[in-house]
Regions:
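Metal-dependent nuclease catalytic cores that hydrolyze phosphodiester bonds in DNA/RNA
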Residues: 1-82, 107
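Mg2+/Mn2+-dependent nuclease catalytic core
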Residues: 57-153
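Conserved pre-motif I regulatory segment
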Residues: 171-214
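A substrate-engagement module of RecA-like helicase motors
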Residues: 178, 184, 237-344, 352, ...
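Walker A/P-loop
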Residues: 206-228
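Signature of the SF2 helicase/ATPase Hel1-core->accessory helical subdomain module
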Residues: 252, 326-343, 347-451, 532-546, ...
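A contiguous, basic/glycine-rich beta-loop/short-helix subdomain that forms a polymer-engagement track
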Residues: 319-339, 344, 355-361, 455-565, ...
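Conserved RecA-like P-loop NTPase helicase motor core
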Residues: 570-580, 626-737
Length: 753
């Protein structure tokens, strides 16, 4: 008999929830007050009362051969000999006492009452909802005595809708599993190493372990990871598969692999989650007073979900069309669908970022498999997720807007002033420097930042009197919330940085991505981190907190080495010599494209270096811009997809055109890489270098060389995409001949000079 666990709160909130989309308060003080209110009330209860009493009720769903185990903890329980009493404690912060209990709060108490009646055979039970202050003072108390039959009837009103959803999902699961059992690999033959990779992924899921895999570009990594994950899904080894990417452009490989698998009559709900602002059709404030889709969204989404469950194709177009049909917010609709989807393709953030990860999935269950594409990005991305800042200059600008719109007595204005004053009062070094590190922050600094975050959240809940400031509130709020979260973690994992002497920016900079990634993925149903540049594997596993029993797998290149001609030319591209190097670089590029006309991409360490060289390059070319939307990027690449013609493009190494794009055949004849890709020397990289020097013994390797050579390998990997592709890569830097850099190159590279 299969067992499914659900909490009392989850069951109740499935049916009893708000109608509108509203920002969850998220106030730090509210969360603290709620806990304190519970504890204070529990201490004030008399003799015989017990706090946080666990209670479970198994519910047999015979036709599904399923046992639904309902569980939770009663806030307070009096085990009286005649009629026991259940108390549900909630925080109340309203100006006036509540006139009646909130339906969802009352239903939670009723559910516990029903569970007691069933498990103890009681004829009746007392239930009450009590609203208290943070000190436990009662603001409202609503007692009831209910018979067992009354409890059962009310309980059924929330259980039956939930069971309807469960039955529908299980019907789909049976059809899905049958189709997955018959699923075959989407190509007639495996490429060399591809089958071994698939076995490794399947084993990682079965063992609930992590796998770190280096897979050369063009080896069919999407199929080699998705196929075994889907097989494991069909066998019940995992509940969902999340395919995570670092960039939107990298999703296409997964989508193409799924499309090919769907040709086998596959019953699979595969969902793509785009950024909220990208999906928004109205581009108004996400508030029921401003957006008709936000108003009443949750009254309409149940019907939309049920209709969506009747179709297999959950493409972005179909999800958007269903959201339009029911006047729903597309993003929130996708968030609801992700709870029952089989496969979800999304950005790293939705699984790993503590600020925006899908709590309804990753806080509620560990029965999820992660397939993490281009995983060499993870250390930097996780550092970004865990870091946060307080920008004094930005706060001053926003405070001016808030002051004009709402007045200087507004709580938000006052809270901003407190933080600005706290930043101004920091004791910075008197050596005239414009940036540096601080050993610690004053004791009251965190307090005023927490208060400002709460004031921000309150303002965002208001009917905004200042629409101009509305958007800026979010831009300032997110780094501040991240800063507050960072300050609650172990200070040993952070460095405190300051930038700008007049109006400083204070950053809590995360140093350790390994510990967080290890914790975030612990106990999941398999995690596969894969990339063409997850190399060297021992070092990358170390950076990502892998355990000794987490497997490493290096997939050999399936393509003949002679198909890629790699040539190195000694050019000094170091920062101090770049101006003089531009002429030689332009000469090398001209010689390459003149001797063998075709389609080429040239990658530079920076936009400044790119522009300097472009001025000396007497050839027609297209140049990557700093800001390019999807349409501009598509137009940029379209030149390569034309059947004929020569194309030369100048791009930035590590940008959108050096990773995640697929130009097979004669769409790309070669690449030129200028420099070895080292990150720019700045405060952040130097702090990282010092950290890795202390912890891993080689700061320059981990802070500079590894990320640099990963970008180089990705760029060169654009050339060979299929078994028949041939091409050239020109590496312009004398350091490519150094043993320390050669060790970081893929084993199949054969370099001539």
């Amino acid at each position: 008999m299969e067992e499914l666990r659900v909490s009392v709160r989850e069951l109740v909130e499935f049916t009893l929830h708000g109608a509108d989309i509203r920002l969850i308060s998220g106030r730090m003080q509210d969360m603290l007050d709620g806990t304190l209110g519970h504890q204070a009330r529990q201490k004030l209860l008399g003799d015989g009362w017990q706090a946080e009493v666990p209670l479970n009720l198994p519910i047999l769903v015979e036709e599904e051969e399923l046992t639904l185990v309902l569980g939770g903890r009663m806030d307070a329980f009096l085990d009286a000999p005649d009629i026991p009493c259940v108390e549900e404690i909630k925080l109340w912060q309203g100006e006036h006492p509540p006139e009646a209990p909130i339906p969802a709060h009352r239903m939670q108490a009723v559910c516990y009452g029903h569970m007691l009646c069933v498990t103890r055979g009681l004829p009746a039970v007392d239930v009450r909802v009590v609203y208290v202050t943070r000190r436990g003072k009662v603001q409202g108390e609503f007692p009831e005595r209910l018979t067992a039959e009354e409890c059962r009837a009310e309980f059924q009103s929330v259980l039956l809708p939930y069971l309807r959803r469960i039955r529908a999902v299980r019907r789909h699961t049976r059809a899905r599993n049958a189709s997955l059992a018959a699923l075959k690999f989407p190509y007639a033959n495996y490429r060399p190493g591809q089958r071994e990779m698939a076995v490794q992924v399947y084993t990682a899921i079965k063992r609930k372990k992590r796998l770190f895999a280096c897979m050369p570009t063009g080896t069919g990594k999407s199929s080699a990871t998705l196929f075994p994950a889907l097989k494991a899904l069909g066998e019940g080894l995992t509940g969902q598969v999340y395919y995570l990417t670092a960039r939107t452009t990298q999703r296409q490989g997964a989508l193409d692999a799924l499309a090919r698998l769907h040709q086998q009559t596959l019953h699979l709900w595969a969902l793509v989650i785009d950024a909220k602002d990208k999906q928004c059709p109205t581009h108004t404030l996400c508030h029921p007073d401003y957006c008709e889709r936000a108003k009443g969204h949750f009254l309409r989404d149940t019907d939309a979900i049920e209709e969506m469950m009747n179709i297999d194709d959950w493409s972005a177009e179909n999800v958007r069309a269903m959201a339009d049909k029911y006047c729903l917010c597309p993003f929130e609709f996708a968030m609801s669908l992700c709870e029952i989807a089989d496969v979800v393709i999304c950005d790293y953030n939705y699984a790993l970022d503590p600020a925006v990860h899908i709590r309804r999935i990753f806080d509620a269950t560990r029965d999820v498999t992660l397939l993490i594409d281009e995983a060499h990005h993870l250390p930097e991305r996780i550092r970004d997720m865990l870091s946060g800042s307080v920008d004094s200059a930005g706060l001053r600008k926003l405070r001016t807007v808030v002051g004009k719109a709402a007045g200087k007595k507004h709580p938000l204005y006052k809270a901003m002033t407190d933080v600005i004053r706290a930043v101004d009062n920091l004791l910075l070094p008197e050596d005239g420097s414009q940036e540096g590190t601080l050993p610690k922050l004053p004791d009251d600094f965190d307090r005023v930042c927490l208060s400002l975050a709460d004031a921000f959240m309150d303002a965002r809940q208001e009917h905004f009197p200042w629409e101009d400031a509305g958007g800026r509130l979010g831009d300032t709020l997110m780094p501040l919330l991240s800063f507050n979260r960072a300050r609650q973690r172990d200070s040993a994992d952070y460095a405190i940085l300051w930038e700008g002497r007049r109006h400083p920016k204070i950053t809590a900079f995360a140093l350790d991505s390994a510990g967080y990634f290890q914790q975030a993925t612990q106990g999941l149903s398999g995690v596969t981190c894969f990339s063409a540049t997850l190399h060297p594997l021992p070092e990358m596993r170390l950076l990502l907190g892998g355990a000794e029993d987490d497997a490493c797998f290096a997939m050999p290149s399936p393509f003949p080495p002679e198909h890629l001609q790699i040539r190195q030319v000694d050019v000094n591209t170091r920062y101090a010599h770049r101006s003089s190097a531009c002429t030689e670089i332009a000469r090398q590029i001209t010689a390459l494209v003149t001797q063998k006309p075709g389609k080429y991409l040239v990658f530079f360490p920076s936009f400044a270096f790119l522009r300097m060289t472009a001025e000396r390059l007497m050839l027609p070319c297209q140049v990557q811009e700093k800001q390019m939307d999807e349409a501009a990027r598509a137009a940029f690449l379209m030149a390569y997809r034309q059947e004929s013609g020569n194309v030369l493009s100048l791009c930035v190494l590590g940008g959108v055109f050096s990773e995640g794009i697929d130009l097979p055949g004669r769409q790309l004849d070669g690449v030129v890489v200028v420099g070895v890709g080292l990150p720019q020397v700045n405060l952040y990289q130097e702090v990282l270098r010092a950290h890795f020097e202390r912890t891993l013994g080689d700061g320059f390797l981990y802070a500079y060389m590894l990320p640099g050579m990963q970008k180089v390998t990705q760029a060169v990997g654009r050339v060979i995409r299929t078994e028949t592709d041939t091409g050239v890569a020109l590496l312009l830097d004398d350091r490519y001949s150094y043993p320390a850099y050669r060790r970081l190159m893929p084993e199949h590279w054969r370099i001539s000079r």
